[in-house]
Amino acid sequence: MFKIREKTNADHKVKYIVDVNEKNWNEAYQKKLNAAVKNVKIQGFRKGHVPYQEAIKHIDQIGLFDRAVNQLVQPIYLELVKQEKIKDSETVLEENPEVSVVEIDDKKLALSYSFETIPEVKVGDYLKINGFLSETPVKDEDVQTELVRIFKSAGKLVDKKEGATLEKGDIAFLDFSGEIDNKAFEGGKAKNYELEIGSNSFIPGFEDQMVGMKVGEKRDLNLTFPKDYHEKTYAGKPVLFKVKLNSIKEVQLPEMTVEKLNELMKTQYKNLDEAKEDIKKRMDRNQQEHANQMNTMLLTQFANEDCQFSHIPKSLLDREVNLLYQQFANQMQQIKMSVEDALKIQNQTKEQLYQRLTEQATRAIKLVLVLEEIGDLEKISVSEAEINQEIEERIKEISNNQELPKEQYDAIKNYFVTQKELIESMLTNKKVVDLIIKKNLAR
């Protein structure tokens, strides 16, 4: 079908110039020419009956070449990838090569295929990353606390008995006024403000220093605004709060029955034990998702700040940006809003959106490249059995653990088999992440 005339490797690209076999080019050209001739319209002739030599005078030659070339681009690409073993290459990306015409006329065709190279990655010390979260099992007391929180939403506020002191979990009604450098500041004063002690609604130390107060008592709280406080004017500054406790209330819980719980949660539990088991699973899942999110953020930061890359392939970047844009468009569609309207509300242009998505895509690609490099360094691999197990797990999720008819099961499995490379990559990266976290937590 073709012969490689030249192969070069420069500027992070491997470029092939191929001379297309004259017979293949002639067949493609003649096929498109004959189709074009049939569609030529000239006054005095019926469509499809214009004399051949007269018809070709009225054909757009550039458009004809373009259609004929397009017929050959994909078959030549597939054969080139196979012949040069690009699919198995550890240095060349097979996806989306740049294709251009080098030479063309009705007798010959030469094409250029330019493949991007896989970036060289210099990984930082991935065994000295601080801040990873481990998956801590949810305890029975955690479940009980969550259960109380749910019932608390239907509770009543009642006055605490006379002479009682303020404790964590109580609701305080207080007057307060704050001073920075002996001067009042905006937002630093309120009357009969409702505050749950232990909710950490105020700056660190405020609620802790109120514990033990009695109704009518006044107290000065010497505190410091956090350095990362959202109001930069106050960040890191000492502050004095003068507080007076007006009343102490506590939440009187309703009777903790399964009937009341079902009413509050809109569920159909048979008993509280079943509810606790389900709540525990949900809390475990939420905790795992939170840990995964935080750990991914740490790894992304490491990949972008402590690792070096020779380049970021445009083909990968374009694909990731398009994927992120589609996700954004789908999210807007779910709330019945167009991308254009969303951008107006955010006071953003489409160019600014693409710039943001490009930055986001770059960070994500760098993380994947780093995980792949660490996977190679640590010689991490995934077995065929692990891939098949993952496929079976995904089928179970889709079927909700129900047995599927054989025809439906086979169709779903065949789809996942076509995604084996993607599944293998996902499982490998998960192993890499687990290894990094495990080794860092063990330090």
From Swiss-Prot:
User: Pfam families attached here?
Assistant: FKBP_C, Trigger_C, Trigger_N
Transmembrane region positions?
none
Q: Which GO terms describe its cellular component?
A: cytoplasm
Under catalytic activity, the entry for this protein gives: [protein]-peptidylproline (omega=180) = [protein]-peptidylproline (omega=0)
> Which PROSITE patterns does the annotation name?
FKBP_PPIASE (PS50059)
Q: Where is the PPIase FKBP-type domain?
A: 169-254
Record localization: Cytoplasm
Q: From what superkingdom does this record's organism come?
A: Bacteria
| InterPro entries recorded | PPIase_dom_sf (IPR046357), PPIase_FKBP_dom (IPR001179), Trig_fac (IPR005215), Trigger_fac_C (IPR008880), Trigger_fac_C_sf (IPR037041), Trigger_fac_ribosome-bd_bac (IPR008881), Trigger_fac_ribosome-bd_sf (IPR036611), Trigger_fact/SurA_dom_sf (IPR027304)
- GO BP annotation list: 'de novo' cotranslational protein folding; cell division; chaperone-mediated protein folding; protein transport; protein unfolding
Q: What is its main location?
A: cytoplasm
Give the EC number(s) under which this enzyme is classified. Answer: 5.2.1.8
Q: Which GO terms describe its molecular function?
A: peptidyl-prolyl cis-trans isomerase activity; protein folding chaperone; ribosome binding
Tell me the keywords, alphabetical order.
Cell cycle, Cell division, Chaperone, Cytoplasm, Isomerase, Rotamase
Instruction: Please state what the annotation says regarding this protein's domains.
Output: Consists of 3 domains; the N-terminus binds the ribosome, the middle domain has PPIase activity, while the C-terminus has intrinsic chaperone activity on its own.
Question: What role does it play?
Answer: Involved in protein export. Acts as a chaperone by maintaining the newly synthesized protein in an open conformation. Functions as a peptidyl-prolyl cis-trans isomerase.
Q: Which family does it belong to?
A: Belongs to the FKBP-type PPIase family. Tig subfamily.
Q: What is this protein called?
A: Trigger factor
Which species does this protein come from? Mycoplasmoides gallisepticum (strain R(low / passage 15 / clone 2)) (Mycoplasma gallisepticum)
